[in-house]
Amino acid sequence: MEFEYWIELVNKIVNIVTGPAVIFSVWFLVAQIRTQIKVGKAASRQSIAEAHQEVTLAGLDPLLMRAKLKLIKKEELSIDEEVGLRIHMTAILRARENHFYQHKMGMLDDEEWKTMRKALGTLFIDNQLNLDIWKKSKSTFNPEFVSIVDEEIDMRKDTFRK
């Protein structure tokens, strides 16, 4: 009888300790998940900053700089210059599409995405070449992203030179 008493007492103590331990474990897991989400978002922002910097620095290539100056001066581009600008613009659009995916997955908050959308729209202001690139390549992009870009272009259509 004394043995059964001790077994029952230990069983009750284990039951008492188990409840709070489970609650603490769940709380700890939730805290870890929240931390990992913050780390993931920070890594995503860092990745976006690096990608943006890469594309921006690539735009400083002498061929692209020469081509951009010609566009500003309304001079005709060589084949190499036009191809370079087309490839560069496509890379920019792919990077922005990636930002769109990250926003959809919750890795970018709404404020960041709104800012990126505005910047996306400015790529087309007074730039017939970029508009042409978009028209010819938009079928290769996510349909939701296409709608967003088209909306941004439409909002700025009054800024395009005829």
Label each region the model flagged.
Residues 81-162:
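An amphipathic alpha-helical interaction surface
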Residues 2-77, 83:
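Membrane-proximal alpha-helical anchors
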